[in-house]
């Protein structure tokens, strides 16, 4: 670059920094880039691997959508539990007014340390979310759900009144404000969304999500969660078989998927995933009905091995670490905002 151009650029950069503050513009020479993307585990080992970076990326917007009773809130609460386990501070904006503290505690959430808001209107919910993010003191915010973010005009109006596009405009405006603050404060914001059917669709999927298109564009990760079957013991139903597809991913290759079990009253069966993925990666050996690790038998039948891993969390953590290292998705936790932990999974 010529001297004249260099001087002109230096003057422009100085003017920008004077007007908008230091760091408003920077050269990507590597010194300003973070070596590793910071993530928060989803609580599902398989999904962490499918995401390609070991969890949900911080400083980004994530959308989780699916049919009713598919495990959307359960997945979010599992992620909240993982964030708290590593010293993170979490907030739950419950627009549906359906938060169950007893169930959350069973999933490992420290309910007494969770900030809960049950707003009256969509505007109030999103303003609370923005204020929490701008504070810089929150690591993760969950909004449950976009469909329940009802605009004030609709609440104050009469039944049957037409309010076309109100919610979509509300979401679009809020996300324009939120995005910059989320990146600056390195906060993870998760929006839970519901599925609706488009009328008159002849070709392609008739399914769509609520709240317009803004969330689809602003989200760095979009997860489609579905219940694929039931887990039974005789006639008793113990849980759901669940599949999550990574529909959009700006931080790793998309279109991967993960399958795991959600057990009623326990949440995601982490030990079950360890067994399945451990066998697939040749970390756990399976011979007939017997499973062995490091040459020692650990149980006959998957259910017995799951119980053994629960009783031996240090071995379970060791297998988890080996699987993550083998797949190149070791998690990177922010220093300073999160306390050191012993690495144990919350009790279920």
Swiss-Prot record:
ATP binds at residues 66-73. One of its GO terms (cellular component) is cytosol. It holds the Pfam family RecA. It is found in: Cytoplasm. InterPro entries: AAA+_ATPase, DNA_recomb/repair_RecA, DNA_recomb/repair_RecA_CS, P-loop_NTPase, RecA-like_C, RecA-like_N, RecA_ATP-bd, RecA_C_sf. GO terms for molecular function: ATP binding; ATP hydrolysis activity; ATP-dependent DNA damage sensor activity; damaged DNA binding; single-stranded DNA binding. One of its GO terms (biological process) is SOS response. Keywords: ATP-binding, Cytoplasm, DNA damage, DNA recombination, DNA repair, DNA-binding, Nucleotide-binding, SOS response. Can catalyze the hydrolysis of ATP in the presence of single-stranded DNA, the ATP-dependent uptake of single-stranded DNA by duplex DNA, and the ATP-dependent hybridization of homologous single-stranded DNAs. It interacts with LexA causing its activation and leading to its autocatalytic cleavage. PANTHER family: MITOCHONDRIAL DNA REPAIR PROTEIN RECA HOMOLOG-RELATED, RECA. Belongs to the RecA family. This is Protein RecA.
